[in-house]
A protein has these predicted regions:
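A conserved glycine-rich beta-strand in the N-terminal activation segment of trypsin-fold
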Residues: 15-24
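Divalent metal-dependent hydrolysis catalytic cores, especially in the metallo-beta-lactamase
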Residues: 62, 66, 78-107, 120-133, ...
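Charged helix-capping and loop-helix junction motifs
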Residues: 73-76, 107-110, 149-151, 227-233
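Generic structural signal for well-ordered alpha-helices
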Residues: 81, 105-112, 153, 179, ...
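Active-site glycine- and acidic-residue-rich loops that bind
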Residues: 100-106, 171-173, 186-198, 248-265, ...
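Divalent metal-binding pocket/active-site signature
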Residues: 127, 135-149, 155-231
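Active-site-adjacent C-terminal substructures of enzyme catalytic domains
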Residues: 200-290
Length: 290
């Protein structure tokens, strides 16, 4: 099926395009042109001045539509994923919060099943925790927090290939062995919920930590201990060339001035915008969510 979208502000790598059109065939973009002349055989959609952008890839989202991916049920996965699809995502990496390994295995089974479906928007599983610094736990449930245990993560990663990213605190005992192993499996490993300073971040990057999750949040910046001043995790990540970052760019988790600083120092190629969405995202019900 051929579809032509006209009369919208089109975002391209070169900037905004007006009075152009986007030609789509079977869900794939064929062409972006500066002409809005009708294409023979195409169904025309009038965007009525709205913004036209490529589909988003949601790389850090814990849930949506009233469900959390950590529920590890097919209903939760489908409902949360559909909530994000309705708001512009075309691909998603469902994110688990700190939980038991029994629940992680259940989520893996669900994820693998759904990824086998034709044109599945689920691209792989993302795990945050449970190997987190309890001092920096934030909203992560501390009842599951622990240090990395190879007797847990190696059997899991030998069993499945659906896990594409795993975030932990790099200063924990065993974190470096964890990162070396996940890197050998092609899994992106990120620092998160951490108070690591420069030497720890530098060492973590060397063994495979390549990304900083929800940059600035759940990690300290420049600080003072007695009369001495120290760089925090934030400055350490800035100083680590090659380490990418993600920011929750909702204007609440970080102010616009900090977002500008991230853009200036890390650049567009090393910065991702994420929602870190919870079950409440795109929830249309009236009842509280458990």
């Amino acid at each position: 099926m051929l579809t032509q979208i006209i009369n919208g502000r089109i975002l391209t790598p070169q900037g905004w395009l007006k009075d152009g059109s986007v030609l789509i065939c079977d869900g794939k973009i064929l062409e972006v042109t500066n002409s809005d002349l009708a294409v023979i055989g195409a169904t025309v959609i009038d965007a009525r001045g709205m913004t036209i952008v490529p589909g988003f890839v949601s790389m850090h989202a814990h849930g949506g539509g009233g469900h959390d991916y950590t529920e590890a049920t097919e209903e939760a996965f489908r409902t949360a994923t559909n909530a994000h699809l309705k708001h512009g995502a075309t691909g998603i990496f469902p994110t688990l919060s700190s939980t038991s390994f029994e629940r992680i295995y259940q989520a893996v089974d669900v994820c693998e099943h759904l990824m086998k479906e034709k044109d599945s928007p689920i691209l792989g599983l993302h795990i945050e925790g449970p190997y987190l610094n309890p001092k920096m736990a934030g909203t992560q449930y501390d009842g599951f927090l622990k240090t990395p245990d190879e007797n847990e993560y190696i059997p899991l990663l030998e069993r499945t290939s659906c896990i594409r990213r795993w975030d932990i605190s790099p200063e924990l005992p065993g974190a470096h062995d964890f990162a070396k192993y996940t890197r050998s499996k092609g899994i992106m490993t990120a620092v998160t919920h951490t108070e690591a300073e420069y030497d720890e971040i530098k060492a973590a990057f060397a063994v495979g930590f390549s990304h900083a999750a929800h940059f600035y949040n759940a990690m300290p910046g420049f600080h003072k201990r007695r009369e001495y001043k120290y760089e925090g995790t934030v400055e350490s990540v800035y100083l680590t060339d090659g380490m990418t970052v993600e920011v929750i760019a909702d204007g609440i988790h970080l102010p616009a001035t900090i977002l500008k600083l991230v853009y200036k120092l890390k650049g567009v190629e090393n910065t991702c915008l994420v929602t870190d969405a919870l079950a409440y995202a795109a929830y249309e019900g009236n009842e509280p969510i458990d």
